[in-house]
Protein backbone atom coordinates (compact mmCIF):
# COMPACT_ATOMS: atom_id res chain seq x y z
CA UNK A 1 0.00 0.00 0.00
CA UNK A 2 1.42 3.39 -0.98
CA UNK A 3 1.88 6.20 1.52
CA UNK A 4 -0.90 8.23 -0.12
CA UNK A 5 -3.31 5.30 0.06
CA UNK A 6 -2.46 4.74 3.71
CA UNK A 7 -3.12 8.40 4.48
CA UNK A 8 -6.49 8.17 2.68
CA UNK A 9 -7.79 5.30 4.82
CA UNK A 10 -8.59 7.41 7.91
CA UNK A 11 -10.66 10.07 6.05
CA UNK A 12 -12.35 7.29 4.06
CA UNK A 13 -13.37 5.50 7.25
CA UNK A 14 -14.56 8.80 8.71
CA UNK A 15 -16.69 9.43 5.63
CA UNK A 16 -18.13 5.92 5.68
CA UNK A 17 -19.06 6.28 9.36
CA UNK A 18 -21.06 9.39 8.46
CA UNK A 19 -22.95 7.34 5.86
CA UNK A 20 -23.51 4.18 7.87
CA UNK A 21 -26.78 3.09 6.26
CA UNK A 22 -25.57 3.47 2.68
CA UNK A 23 -22.26 1.79 3.50
CA UNK A 24 -24.01 -1.07 5.29
CA UNK A 25 -26.39 -1.63 2.38
CA UNK A 26 -23.59 -1.90 -0.17
CA UNK A 27 -21.58 -4.19 2.14
CA UNK A 28 -24.60 -6.48 2.62
CA UNK A 29 -25.28 -6.48 -1.12
CA UNK A 30 -21.70 -7.49 -1.85
CA UNK A 31 -21.79 -10.14 0.91
CA UNK A 32 -25.00 -11.69 -0.41
CA UNK A 33 -23.70 -11.63 -3.98
CA UNK A 34 -20.41 -13.21 -2.90
CA UNK A 35 -22.17 -16.00 -1.00
CA UNK A 36 -24.57 -16.83 -3.82
CA UNK A 37 -21.95 -16.52 -6.57
CA UNK A 38 -19.52 -18.86 -4.76
CA UNK A 39 -22.18 -21.52 -4.25
CA UNK A 40 -23.61 -21.06 -7.74
CA UNK A 41 -20.15 -21.48 -9.30
CA UNK A 42 -19.68 -24.61 -7.23
CA UNK A 43 -23.04 -26.02 -8.35
CA UNK A 44 -22.23 -25.21 -11.99
CA UNK A 45 -18.90 -27.00 -11.63
CA UNK A 46 -20.66 -29.97 -10.07
CA UNK A 47 -23.15 -30.14 -12.95
CA UNK A 48 -20.38 -29.83 -15.54
CA UNK A 49 -18.48 -32.67 -13.86
CA UNK A 50 -21.60 -34.84 -14.12
CA UNK A 51 -22.16 -33.90 -17.75
CA UNK A 52 -18.53 -34.66 -18.64
CA UNK A 53 -18.53 -37.98 -16.80
CA UNK A 54 -16.65 -40.67 -18.71
CA UNK A 55 -19.03 -43.41 -19.84
CA UNK A 56 -16.30 -45.94 -20.60
CA UNK A 57 -17.80 -46.72 -23.99
CA UNK A 58 -17.17 -45.45 -27.53
CA UNK A 59 -19.61 -42.55 -27.20
CA UNK A 60 -19.24 -41.10 -30.71
CA UNK A 61 -19.36 -44.44 -32.55
CA UNK A 62 -22.59 -45.96 -31.24
CA UNK A 63 -26.21 -45.90 -32.33
CA UNK A 64 -29.11 -47.46 -30.48
CA UNK A 65 -32.24 -49.13 -31.82
CA UNK A 66 -34.79 -50.29 -29.26
CA UNK A 67 -37.20 -52.53 -31.08
CA UNK A 68 -39.66 -55.39 -30.78
CA UNK A 69 -42.00 -57.35 -33.02
CA UNK A 70 -45.73 -57.96 -32.89
CA UNK A 71 -44.77 -61.64 -33.02
CA UNK A 72 -43.42 -61.28 -29.48
CA UNK A 73 -46.82 -60.46 -28.00
CA UNK A 74 -47.26 -64.16 -27.19
CA UNK A 75 -44.54 -63.90 -24.50
CA UNK A 76 -42.97 -67.09 -25.82
CA UNK A 77 -39.25 -67.44 -24.95
CA UNK A 78 -38.52 -69.32 -28.16
CA UNK A 79 -40.18 -66.62 -30.27
CA UNK A 80 -38.31 -63.87 -28.40
CA UNK A 81 -35.01 -65.60 -29.04
CA UNK A 82 -35.79 -66.23 -32.70
CA UNK A 83 -36.80 -62.61 -33.32
CA UNK A 84 -33.80 -61.19 -31.45
CA UNK A 85 -31.30 -63.36 -33.32
CA UNK A 86 -33.00 -62.53 -36.61
CA UNK A 87 -32.74 -58.80 -35.89
CA UNK A 88 -29.14 -59.10 -34.74
CA UNK A 89 -28.15 -61.02 -37.87
CA UNK A 90 -29.88 -58.41 -40.06
CA UNK A 91 -28.15 -55.52 -38.31
CA UNK A 92 -24.71 -57.08 -38.57
CA UNK A 93 -25.12 -57.19 -42.35
CA UNK A 94 -25.87 -53.47 -42.66
CA UNK A 95 -23.01 -51.68 -44.49
CA UNK A 96 -20.89 -49.67 -42.06
CA UNK A 97 -21.73 -51.74 -38.97
CA UNK A 98 -18.50 -52.90 -37.31
CA UNK A 99 -20.03 -54.54 -34.24
CA UNK A 100 -23.56 -55.21 -33.00
CA UNK A 101 -24.90 -56.40 -29.66
CA UNK A 102 -28.11 -56.87 -27.71
CA UNK A 103 -28.01 -55.22 -24.29
CA UNK A 104 -30.55 -54.85 -21.52
CA UNK A 105 -29.45 -51.29 -20.73
CA UNK A 106 -26.85 -48.68 -21.65
CA UNK A 107 -25.00 -45.89 -19.83
CA UNK A 108 -27.18 -42.84 -19.17
CA UNK A 109 -30.13 -44.72 -20.64
CA UNK A 110 -32.37 -43.99 -17.66
CA UNK A 111 -33.68 -47.45 -16.77
CA UNK A 112 -31.28 -49.49 -14.64
CA UNK A 113 -31.10 -53.09 -13.41
CA UNK A 114 -29.23 -53.09 -10.09
CA UNK A 115 -28.18 -55.77 -7.64
CA UNK A 116 -26.52 -55.92 -4.24
CA UNK A 117 -23.03 -57.43 -4.10
CA UNK A 118 -21.55 -59.38 -1.17
CA UNK A 119 -18.07 -60.72 -0.52
CA UNK A 120 -19.34 -63.71 1.47
CA UNK A 121 -22.47 -65.83 1.18
CA UNK A 122 -23.59 -65.16 4.77
CA UNK A 123 -23.03 -61.40 4.69
CA UNK A 124 -25.90 -59.48 6.31
CA UNK A 125 -25.38 -56.08 4.69
CA UNK A 126 -24.19 -55.77 1.07
CA UNK A 127 -20.77 -54.32 0.33
CA UNK A 128 -22.15 -52.26 -2.54
CA UNK A 129 -24.96 -51.91 -5.05
CA UNK A 130 -23.96 -52.33 -8.71
CA UNK A 131 -25.73 -52.01 -12.02
CA UNK A 132 -25.97 -55.21 -14.07
CA UNK A 133 -25.27 -55.41 -17.81
CA UNK A 134 -26.13 -58.62 -19.63
CA UNK A 135 -23.90 -59.67 -22.53
CA UNK A 136 -25.16 -61.90 -25.34
CA UNK A 137 -21.66 -62.34 -26.72
CA UNK A 138 -20.24 -59.09 -28.07
CA UNK A 139 -20.90 -56.32 -25.55
CA UNK A 140 -17.26 -55.58 -24.68
CA UNK A 141 -16.21 -55.11 -28.31
CA UNK A 142 -19.37 -53.26 -29.34
CA UNK A 143 -19.24 -50.83 -26.43
CA UNK A 144 -15.51 -50.38 -26.98
CA UNK A 145 -14.68 -51.15 -23.36
CA UNK A 146 -11.02 -51.12 -22.37
CA UNK A 147 -9.88 -54.22 -20.49
CA UNK A 148 -7.37 -53.31 -17.79
CA UNK A 149 -6.90 -56.85 -16.51
CA UNK A 150 -8.09 -60.34 -17.32
CA UNK A 151 -10.04 -61.28 -20.42
CA UNK A 152 -13.36 -61.20 -22.23
CA UNK A 153 -15.90 -64.03 -21.91
CA UNK A 154 -15.32 -67.33 -23.72
CA UNK A 155 -18.11 -68.67 -25.91
CA UNK A 156 -18.82 -71.58 -23.55
CA UNK A 157 -19.43 -69.21 -20.60
CA UNK A 158 -22.67 -67.75 -21.96
CA UNK A 159 -26.13 -68.95 -20.99
CA UNK A 160 -29.67 -67.82 -21.75
CA UNK A 161 -31.17 -65.75 -18.96
CA UNK A 162 -34.36 -67.83 -19.21
CA UNK A 163 -32.36 -70.97 -18.38
CA UNK A 164 -30.88 -69.20 -15.36
CA UNK A 165 -34.35 -68.24 -14.16
CA UNK A 166 -35.64 -71.80 -14.57
CA UNK A 167 -32.73 -73.24 -12.58
CA UNK A 168 -34.06 -71.77 -9.33
CA UNK A 169 -31.81 -72.46 -6.33
CA UNK A 170 -29.33 -74.25 -8.58
CA UNK A 171 -28.74 -71.16 -10.72
CA UNK A 172 -25.12 -70.15 -11.20
CA UNK A 173 -23.27 -67.29 -12.84
CA UNK A 174 -19.72 -68.65 -12.68
CA UNK A 175 -17.91 -65.63 -14.14
CA UNK A 176 -18.29 -61.87 -14.53
CA UNK A 177 -16.48 -58.77 -15.70
CA UNK A 178 -16.51 -55.72 -13.43
CA UNK A 179 -15.41 -52.12 -13.82
CA UNK A 180 -12.45 -50.58 -12.04
CA UNK A 181 -14.56 -48.64 -9.52
CA UNK A 182 -16.20 -51.86 -8.36
CA UNK A 183 -12.87 -53.70 -8.25
CA UNK A 184 -11.28 -51.01 -6.10
CA UNK A 185 -14.25 -51.02 -3.72
CA UNK A 186 -14.41 -54.81 -3.34
CA UNK A 187 -10.68 -55.56 -3.37
CA UNK A 188 -8.74 -52.38 -2.49
CA UNK A 189 -5.06 -52.61 -3.41
CA UNK A 190 -5.47 -56.12 -4.85
CA UNK A 191 -5.75 -57.72 -8.27
CA UNK A 192 -9.47 -58.39 -8.67
CA UNK A 193 -9.04 -61.09 -11.34
CA UNK A 194 -9.68 -64.48 -9.77
CA UNK A 195 -11.51 -63.05 -6.75
CA UNK A 196 -15.13 -64.02 -6.06
CA UNK A 197 -18.29 -62.20 -4.99
CA UNK A 198 -21.96 -63.07 -4.53
CA UNK A 199 -24.82 -61.51 -6.48
CA UNK A 200 -28.03 -62.76 -8.11
CA UNK A 201 -27.41 -66.38 -7.06
CA UNK A 202 -26.29 -68.28 -3.97
CA UNK A 203 -23.19 -69.50 -5.81
CA UNK A 204 -19.96 -67.48 -6.03
CA UNK A 205 -19.12 -65.51 -9.16
CA UNK A 206 -15.46 -65.26 -10.17
CA UNK A 207 -14.03 -62.08 -11.68
CA UNK A 208 -12.33 -62.83 -15.01
CA UNK A 209 -11.83 -59.28 -16.24
CA UNK A 210 -11.74 -55.64 -15.19
CA UNK A 211 -12.70 -52.85 -17.60
CA UNK A 212 -11.48 -49.29 -17.16
CA UNK A 213 -14.92 -47.78 -16.78
CA UNK A 214 -18.59 -48.48 -17.44
CA UNK A 215 -21.12 -45.92 -16.26
CA UNK A 216 -24.51 -46.63 -14.74
CA UNK A 217 -27.73 -45.95 -16.67
CA UNK A 218 -28.92 -43.70 -13.81
CA UNK A 219 -28.52 -43.02 -10.07
CA UNK A 220 -25.00 -41.73 -10.66
CA UNK A 221 -24.78 -40.64 -7.02
CA UNK A 222 -24.93 -44.27 -5.84
CA UNK A 223 -21.38 -45.02 -6.97
CA UNK A 224 -20.02 -45.92 -10.40
CA UNK A 225 -20.18 -49.68 -9.80
CA UNK A 226 -20.99 -51.91 -12.77
CA UNK A 227 -20.71 -55.60 -13.62
CA UNK A 228 -21.30 -57.63 -16.77
CA UNK A 229 -22.82 -61.11 -16.69
CA UNK A 230 -22.53 -63.51 -19.68
CA UNK A 231 -26.30 -63.81 -20.02
CA UNK A 232 -28.22 -63.78 -23.29
CA UNK A 233 -31.35 -61.73 -22.70
CA UNK A 234 -33.64 -62.01 -25.71
CA UNK A 235 -36.73 -60.36 -24.22
CA UNK A 236 -38.85 -58.01 -26.30
CA UNK A 237 -37.86 -54.35 -26.43
CA UNK A 238 -34.14 -54.80 -25.80
CA UNK A 239 -31.52 -52.37 -27.06
CA UNK A 240 -29.63 -53.19 -30.26
CA UNK A 241 -26.31 -51.33 -30.16
CA UNK A 242 -24.42 -50.78 -33.40
CA UNK A 243 -20.84 -49.56 -33.62
CA UNK A 244 -19.77 -47.65 -36.70
CA UNK A 245 -17.62 -44.72 -37.81
CA UNK A 246 -18.55 -41.40 -36.13
CA UNK A 247 -19.34 -39.75 -39.46
CA UNK A 248 -21.62 -42.58 -40.61
CA UNK A 249 -23.94 -42.86 -37.62
CA UNK A 250 -26.97 -41.18 -39.22
CA UNK A 251 -26.47 -43.16 -42.45
CA UNK A 252 -26.09 -46.48 -40.61
CA UNK A 253 -29.07 -45.80 -38.35
CA UNK A 254 -31.32 -45.06 -41.31
CA UNK A 255 -30.09 -48.12 -43.22
CA UNK A 256 -30.52 -50.34 -40.14
CA UNK A 257 -34.16 -49.31 -39.65
CA UNK A 258 -34.91 -49.95 -43.33
CA UNK A 259 -33.24 -53.36 -43.15
CA UNK A 260 -35.24 -54.36 -40.06
CA UNK A 261 -38.52 -53.24 -41.63
CA UNK A 262 -37.72 -55.27 -44.72
CA UNK A 263 -36.91 -58.30 -42.57
CA UNK A 264 -39.98 -57.97 -40.35
CA UNK A 265 -43.09 -56.00 -41.42
CA UNK A 266 -44.32 -56.37 -37.82
CA UNK A 267 -41.41 -54.30 -36.48
CA UNK A 268 -42.10 -51.86 -33.64
CA UNK A 269 -39.38 -49.25 -33.13
CA UNK A 270 -39.41 -47.73 -29.64
CA UNK A 271 -36.22 -45.66 -29.92
CA UNK A 272 -33.67 -44.90 -32.62
CA UNK A 273 -30.84 -42.50 -31.84
CA UNK A 274 -27.11 -42.03 -31.45
CA UNK A 275 -25.52 -42.50 -28.05
CA UNK A 276 -24.62 -38.79 -28.05
CA UNK A 277 -28.35 -38.04 -28.22
CA UNK A 278 -29.06 -40.51 -25.41
CA UNK A 279 -26.44 -38.82 -23.28
CA UNK A 280 -27.67 -35.30 -24.11
CA UNK A 281 -31.23 -36.18 -23.06
CA UNK A 282 -30.06 -37.72 -19.80
CA UNK A 283 -28.13 -34.58 -18.80
CA UNK A 284 -30.75 -32.14 -20.12
CA UNK A 285 -31.83 -31.06 -16.62
CA UNK A 286 -28.21 -30.62 -15.50
CA UNK A 287 -27.55 -28.43 -18.52
CA UNK A 288 -30.67 -26.35 -17.85
CA UNK A 289 -29.69 -25.97 -14.19
CA UNK A 290 -26.19 -24.81 -15.12
CA UNK A 291 -27.53 -22.17 -17.51
CA UNK A 292 -30.08 -21.00 -14.94
CA UNK A 293 -27.30 -20.53 -12.39
CA UNK A 294 -25.25 -18.61 -14.97
CA UNK A 295 -28.21 -16.26 -15.45
CA UNK A 296 -28.54 -15.85 -11.67
CA UNK A 297 -24.84 -15.01 -11.35
CA UNK A 298 -24.95 -12.47 -14.18
CA UNK A 299 -28.11 -10.86 -12.76
CA UNK A 300 -26.62 -10.60 -9.27
CA UNK A 301 -23.36 -9.13 -10.54
CA UNK A 302 -25.29 -6.63 -12.66
CA UNK A 303 -27.47 -5.54 -9.72
CA UNK A 304 -24.41 -5.24 -7.48
CA UNK A 305 -22.54 -3.21 -10.10
CA UNK A 306 -25.51 -0.86 -10.51
CA UNK A 307 -25.69 -0.45 -6.74
CA UNK A 308 -22.01 0.46 -6.55
CA UNK A 309 -22.33 2.91 -9.46
CA UNK A 310 -25.39 4.54 -7.93
CA UNK A 311 -23.86 4.92 -4.49
CA UNK A 312 -20.53 6.17 -5.83
CA UNK A 313 -22.28 8.70 -8.09
CA UNK A 314 -24.36 9.94 -5.16
CA UNK A 315 -21.27 10.35 -2.99
CA UNK A 316 -19.38 12.18 -5.73
CA UNK A 317 -22.28 14.60 -6.08
CA UNK A 318 -22.41 15.15 -2.32
CA UNK A 319 -18.67 15.68 -2.03
CA UNK A 320 -18.13 17.99 -4.96
CA UNK A 321 -16.98 20.85 -2.72
CA UNK A 322 -14.68 18.54 -0.72
CA UNK A 323 -13.15 17.24 -3.93
CA UNK A 324 -12.66 20.79 -5.21
CA UNK A 325 -10.90 21.76 -1.98
CA UNK A 326 -8.55 18.80 -2.25
CA UNK A 327 -7.80 19.71 -5.86
CA UNK A 328 -7.11 23.31 -4.80
CA UNK A 329 -4.72 22.02 -2.12
CA UNK A 330 -2.73 20.16 -4.76
CA UNK A 331 -4.38 16.74 -5.07
CA UNK A 332 -3.96 15.32 -8.56
CA UNK A 333 -6.66 13.65 -10.61
CA UNK A 334 -4.94 10.32 -10.05
CA UNK A 335 -5.07 10.78 -6.28
CA UNK A 336 -8.80 11.57 -6.37
CA UNK A 337 -9.38 8.53 -8.60
CA UNK A 338 -7.41 6.26 -6.27
CA UNK A 339 -9.29 7.68 -3.26
CA UNK A 340 -12.65 6.44 -4.56
CA UNK A 341 -11.16 3.16 -5.76
CA UNK A 342 -9.67 2.55 -2.31
CA UNK A 343 -12.98 3.43 -0.69
CA UNK A 344 -14.73 0.87 -2.87
CA UNK A 345 -12.01 -1.69 -2.21
CA UNK A 346 -12.50 -1.35 1.56
CA UNK A 347 -16.27 -1.73 1.28
CA UNK A 348 -15.88 -4.71 -1.05
CA UNK A 349 -13.35 -6.35 1.28
CA UNK A 350 -15.71 -6.16 4.26
CA UNK A 351 -18.57 -7.45 2.10
CA UNK A 352 -16.46 -10.28 0.71
CA UNK A 353 -15.33 -11.34 4.19
CA UNK A 354 -18.94 -11.53 5.34
CA UNK A 355 -19.89 -13.19 2.05
CA UNK A 356 -17.36 -15.98 2.53
CA UNK A 357 -18.82 -16.79 5.94
CA UNK A 358 -22.31 -16.69 4.46
CA UNK A 359 -21.22 -18.86 1.51
CA UNK A 360 -19.94 -21.51 3.90
CA UNK A 361 -23.18 -21.36 5.91
CA UNK A 362 -25.31 -21.74 2.78
CA UNK A 363 -23.18 -24.70 1.72
CA UNK A 364 -23.71 -26.36 5.10
CA UNK A 365 -27.45 -25.92 4.64
CA UNK A 366 -27.34 -27.42 1.13
CA UNK A 367 -25.23 -30.33 2.39
CA UNK A 368 -27.86 -31.13 5.00
CA UNK A 369 -30.91 -30.67 2.76
CA UNK A 370 -29.70 -31.99 -0.62
CA UNK A 371 -26.62 -34.08 0.26
CA UNK A 372 -24.30 -31.87 -1.77
CA UNK A 373 -20.55 -32.14 -1.19
CA UNK A 374 -18.62 -29.56 0.81
CA UNK A 375 -17.81 -26.29 -0.95
CA UNK A 376 -14.16 -26.47 -2.09
CA UNK A 377 -12.11 -23.59 -0.69
CA UNK A 378 -10.84 -22.47 -4.09
CA UNK A 379 -14.31 -21.16 -5.00
CA UNK A 380 -14.03 -18.51 -2.26
CA UNK A 381 -11.03 -16.62 -3.73
CA UNK A 382 -12.61 -16.93 -7.18
CA UNK A 383 -15.73 -15.17 -5.91
CA UNK A 384 -13.64 -12.62 -4.02
CA UNK A 385 -11.51 -11.71 -7.04
CA UNK A 386 -14.62 -11.44 -9.23
CA UNK A 387 -16.26 -9.01 -6.81
CA UNK A 388 -13.11 -6.95 -6.29
CA UNK A 389 -12.75 -6.55 -10.05
CA UNK A 390 -16.47 -5.83 -10.41
CA UNK A 391 -16.27 -3.17 -7.71
CA UNK A 392 -13.29 -1.46 -9.30
CA UNK A 393 -14.92 -1.52 -12.72
CA UNK A 394 -18.22 -0.19 -11.36
CA UNK A 395 -16.65 2.66 -9.40
CA UNK A 396 -14.31 3.71 -12.20
CA UNK A 397 -16.89 5.89 -13.99
CA UNK A 398 -18.01 7.90 -10.94
CA UNK A 399 -14.37 8.11 -9.76
CA UNK A 400 -13.31 9.59 -13.11
CA UNK A 401 -16.06 12.19 -12.85
CA UNK A 402 -14.83 13.01 -9.34
CA UNK A 403 -11.26 13.34 -10.61
CA UNK A 404 -12.45 15.75 -13.29
CA UNK A 405 -13.82 18.25 -10.73
CA UNK A 406 -11.73 21.44 -11.16
CA UNK A 407 -10.16 23.25 -8.18
CA UNK A 408 -12.28 26.32 -8.97
CA UNK A 409 -15.36 24.46 -7.69
CA UNK A 410 -14.08 25.01 -4.14
CA UNK A 411 -14.22 28.80 -4.54
CA UNK A 412 -17.58 28.80 -6.36
CA UNK A 413 -19.14 26.69 -3.59
CA UNK A 414 -18.11 29.07 -0.81
PLM segments and residue spans:
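Membrane-helix entry/capping segments
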Residues: 3, 7, 14, 18, ...
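Intracellular coupling helices
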Residues: 6, 10-17, 21, 306-347, ...
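Hydrophobic alpha-helical transmembrane segments of multi-pass inner-membrane transport and secretion
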Residues: 18-45, 286-321, 349-354, 389, ...
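Alpha-helical transmembrane segments
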Residues: 32-60, 367
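Membrane-interface junction motifs in transport/secretion proteins
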Residues: 49-81
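Mid-to-C-terminal secondary-structure elements
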Residues: 93-99, 105-282
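Transmembrane alpha-helical interface segments in multi-pass membrane proteins
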Residues: 300, 321-367, 381-382, 386
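Hydrophobic alpha-helical transmembrane segments of polytopic membrane proteins
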Residues: 302-305, 379-401
Amino acid sequence: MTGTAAMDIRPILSTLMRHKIASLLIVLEIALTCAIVCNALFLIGDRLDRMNMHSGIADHELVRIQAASLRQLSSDDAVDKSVSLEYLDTLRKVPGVRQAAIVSQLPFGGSSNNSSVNLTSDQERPTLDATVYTDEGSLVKTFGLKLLAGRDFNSDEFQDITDLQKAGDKAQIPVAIINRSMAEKLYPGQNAVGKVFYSWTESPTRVIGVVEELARPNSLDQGAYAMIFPLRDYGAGKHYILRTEPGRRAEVLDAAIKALKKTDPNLLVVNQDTFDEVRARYFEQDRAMAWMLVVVIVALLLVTALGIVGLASFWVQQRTKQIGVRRALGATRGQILRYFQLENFLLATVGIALGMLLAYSINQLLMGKYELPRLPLHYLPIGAIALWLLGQAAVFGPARRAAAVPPAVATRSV
